[in-house]
Amino acid sequence: MPKMKSHRGACKRFKKTASGRVKREKMYGSHNLEKKNRKRTRRIHQSTLVDKTQEKQIKRMILA
């Protein structure tokens, strides 16, 4: 059986942390930032952890 291929789109979007959780960037942070207030843009630029209900599927996609 051939080797499993990782999902390249998921590999670009998610990273595995040292503790084993999956980290992701928040959405709405690439353009039109002048319309959003400073508090919102500051929160957008912080990364967050993936929800535990989706963690198993994403780990399978990135082969972690």
Curated annotation (Swiss-Prot):
Protein name listed in UniProt: Large ribosomal subunit protein bL35
Keyword Cytoplasm: no
Compositional bias of kind Basic and acidic residues: 25-35
GO cellular component: cytosolic large ribosomal subunit
UniProt organism field: Chlorobium phaeobacteroides (strain BS1)
Record GO terms (molecular function): structural constituent of ribosome
InterPro entries recorded: Ribosomal_bL35, Ribosomal_bL35-like, Ribosomal_bL35_CS, Ribosomal_bL35_sf
Family of the protein in this entry: Belongs to the bacterial ribosomal protein bL35 family.
PANTHER family per the UniProt record, alphabetical: 54S RIBOSOMAL PROTEIN BL35M, LARGE RIBOSOMAL SUBUNIT PROTEIN BL35M
Domain of life: Bacteria
GO biological process: translation
